[in-house]
Structure formats: C-alpha cells, structure tokens
Swiss-Prot record:
The gene is ybeY. Its cofactor is Zn(2+). It is an enzyme of class 3 (hydrolase). It comes from the Bacteria. NCBIfam families: rRNA maturation RNase YbeY (TIGR00043). It comes from Geobacillus thermodenitrificans (strain NG80-2). This is Endoribonuclease YbeY. Its EC number is 3.1.-.-.
C-alpha cells in the first residue's frame, strides 16, 4: 500500500530516523485501513504557540493541544462528493505539537518515539473518519490505535 506522506518539521527537533519510523507506521495504518493507493497526507511538527493558535482558530479552544487533524475529504451537510473514483484522495493534514509530545511521553513514562507514533496514528485515524465524541467511538478508535501500534511494534 503506497501512500504519499509529506513531513514538515517547523521545530527542527525530529530526526530523519524518527520521520522514517513515522512514515513506516503511517503506511502500516494505511494498509490496516485499506486506504486507496496514492492517497496523500501531510504531517507537520510545530511548537505549542503555533498549535495553540490553530486550536483557537479552528476549534475555539485557546490552549495548546497535542495533535490536530484537518480532513480534506469530509463532506459538509448538503454537499455532494465530486471526487472521481480514479482520483487518489488527499486525506488531509496532521499537526503535532513537539513540546506536548515530549511532555506527554514523560508523563506516561514511555519514549518520545512512542508518543509521536501514538499522535500520528491518532491524527491519521481522524482523517479516515474515526472520532471519540462518545464512549463507544472512543473505545473503537483507541482499540484501533493500539492494534496498529502493537502490530508495528511500537508499544509502551
């Protein structure tokens, strides 16, 4: 399963090796979820101020968060799907706060790489339509995250 993944590191704190691991992990998640060949996603690493502004502007929450996802394939109410069947989907953007990832890795007692992987998979699943607004949705989404991370070998 080949998908196009673009990484943008605004922090210069993520190593080439960590990016390679995340690329493999996202490809694994795409395979598990049967994402169409040629789909595209971008992953950006930012600081707390940048993600705080995005969280405020797009979610109305004026505080930094760990990960945001912006799905480009979501249909709004009353919209029709105009994407051709043969056009690879642009899934959207995943934005990860590096300071939050480091803080949470320390808080949960696991590696920075594990936390980055968790946040990347979490964001990726949001792009595919998973959510955690209800207890049932949360159970399904978090079980899927753990399945992918365990299958990849990125455990706590």
């Amino acid at each position: 399963m080949t998908i196009q993944i673009d990484f943008i590191d605004e922090t210069n704190e993520v190593t080439a090796e960590q990016i390679e691991t995340l690329e493999q992990l996202i490809r694994e998640a795409a395979a598990v979820e049967n994402v169409p060949e040629g789909a595209e996603v971008s992953v950006s690493f930012v600081d707390n101020e940048r993600i705080r502004v995005m969280n405020r502007d797009y979610r109305g929450k004026d505080a930094p968060t760990d990960v945001l996802s912006f799905a480009l394939e979501e249909e709004g109410e009353g919209e029709i799907d105009i994407i051709g069947a043969d056009v690879p989907p642009v899934l959207g953007d995943i934005i990860i706060s590096i300071p939050k990832a480091k803080e949470q890795a320390a808080e949960y007692g696991h590696s920075f790489m594990r936390e980055l992987g968790f946040l990347a998979v979490h964001g990726f699943l949001h792009l595919l339509g998973y959510d955690h607004e209800t207890e049932e949705e949360e159970r399904v989404m978090f079980a899927k995250q753990e399945e992918i991370l365990t299958r990849f070998g990125l455990t706590r």
